[in-house]
Amino acid sequence: MTDREEVVELRGHIIDSLIFSRVLDTIMEMGGDFEILEFKVGKRKTDPSFAKILVKGKDPEHLREIVSELRKYGAVPVHTQEVRLEPAPADGVCPRGFYTTTNHRTFVLFDGEWIEVEDIEMDCAIVVYPEERRAVAKPIREVREGELVVVGDRGVRVKPPERPRGRTGIFGFMESEVSPEKPTPTLIRRIAEELEWHRKNGKIVVVVGPAVIHAGARDDLAWMIREGYVDVLFAGNAVATHDVEASLFGTSLGVDLETGEPVKGGHSHHLYAINEIRRVGGLREAVEKGILKDGIMYECIVNDVPYVLAGSIRDDGPIPDVITDVMEAQAEMRRHLKGATLVLMMATMLHSIATGNLLPSWVKTICVDINPAVVTKLMDRGTAQALGIVSDVGVFLPELVKELKRVRDDEA
């Protein structure tokens, strides 16, 4: 074998998850060549498959580029060396050439042992703590001077998601594609069943934009919070503002939520709502004083559902609960996403993509938006596990709540 050739191995459900074909396609697309040295197909549904492939490049550097790309699919060189570690030169600075993570399960070979990287998310560095035999994914800004950072991709193994073997629900039904479908009863029923399962067995994070209120689905989301289908809520200043506006004035953006007609002087209602919350000190104080008596934020507070309101450069006010430091908001989102098993994103491109960037690839994700480009952007930016449903949230959410009630009645 020459310095232009290297043998890599693939293990797992590499056929029906299309990993094997993607590896071969990548080699050819990058101008390389390959030879399949060994290929064993699992005979039963639970049996993994195995492939050993000789990868050929035009020169050593070209080979290195190909093998580096193949690592994203879980390919590991047969003669794997241990990770190369270098100390961070300063707080918030990594060594040059540091390894940048994907959002897939990742392992590093250290002291003869494959160690799984904790807190994995895309676009981070990997810090190894030798005495604790731990490896942790960290954003660049959180790396401290002297910490040992993985440099290059030597000794790194990535395990991309495989096609689910057991219960798949809506995720098996939709096969991870952006769906142009309207929310049919069958589709929404499957989503409701998924939510019910995660309500009992997991942790549901819901990410929403203000269209939930504008489109008249505020009461439906409030019901979901009250009934335990929301463990954490992510939103921005606008959601809280228009939710309070709806509670105090019955309007959203100055439009009567019952009649759909603009209200005289309604253009000021959201500012009056912000001012009222600022006057008493915050949303919780407004609930305690009996000012805020219903709605999304009310249900979060009375049901002890944590929320993260992340600020934007265009915000009015903002409401005191809003985190205006974006790095602090991101850190809070990251903290609350730990242990999440299902994320439901509705009618917000900004917060959906921000949340998606923090998620491991095995967390089930549903994105609902009237604009198909939002779902496409979310997936293009790395959240490839997202299931997209193109729908008006004002239609989708009320139907989802109806199906959730039916699911609960059926199980009663």
Curated annotation (Swiss-Prot):
It catalyses: L-ornithine = L-proline + NH4(+). Its cofactor is NAD(+). Belongs to the AgrE/ArgZ ornithine cyclodeaminase family. Catalyzes the conversion of ornithine to proline, with the release of ammonia. CDD domains: SDH_N_domain (cd12144). It comes from Methanopyrus kandleri (strain AV19 / DSM 6324 / JCM 9639 / NBRC 100938). Signal peptide: none annotated. This is Ornithine cyclodeaminase. The keyword S-adenosyl-L-methionine does not apply. Keywords: Lyase, NAD, Nucleotide-binding.
